[in-house]
Amino acid sequence: MISKEQAAEKAIAEFITGITELPEWVKLYKINHHSPSQANTSDDMWGYKYLYLTQEERRDLPINSKMFSGVCIGDMGQLEFGNFIWEYEKGKGLTKKPIPPTRKVFEKIIEKFNQYGPANEDDKIQHDVNRKGLALLFDQFKKGFREVGLKGEIECERSVELMLPDCVLPMIGRVDFEDADQFIELKTKWRKKNRPRKDGTSSYSLPKIDEGYLGWNEHLLQVAFYFLATGKKPNLLVVHEEGYNLFNENNCDDLKPENLKLLLNKMKIV
């Protein structure tokens, strides 16, 4: 079965064939697009990942439990609320497919969660911590999702692109959840390890999720991309196991359209 990452690469390759003039470095390094996450990557790390490593080596880079746990919450959200998901189909590219009704969503995804292979011992401990909060966080996510109030058909992972000023390659990303008028960018926050106690043990505490939290500026940039690419009302839903915050133009100046548009120039520095 083709992975989401491989499906995205195939769809992007098809999109790139429509660009008639590409510089030599694009062919040399096999770079065919930028992504919203790349816009938040430092130059040295970007150079290492996209100029030094091959595409196959990038795919083998380890992720961490917090990232994987966030993916699992997204998967649960798709099964719980989604009507359609965009997946790659050979010969057709990305195709809109119905999401069949699913019972016992949490039980289904916990199987995937338990198959995760930790990168090291610290990551294993973090994954065990995440497991304890997974159901609680999913409950908070459902409350936040319902507050947004998406209506009609809800689509998941639709691929959208944006040509940035002075850039020869498109920026491409996939929308977490959307209806005809608005979208949700989901961010999950997991307990973080505190400084070790005198006896060498450590506790784990919940991070802040109020405006300006750690990672706020990076997430704003991603929301700005999806806003500019879709023209839909943005909602940034940030969740941890004891609560959630929903940010949009009604309660956050940073997410007003005029302010998101100001991030366009910053976005193109990739």
Region spans (language model):
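Mg2+/Mn2+-dependent nuclease catalytic core
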Residues: 153-269
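Metal-dependent nuclease catalytic cores that hydrolyze phosphodiester bonds in DNA/RNA
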Residues: 1-174
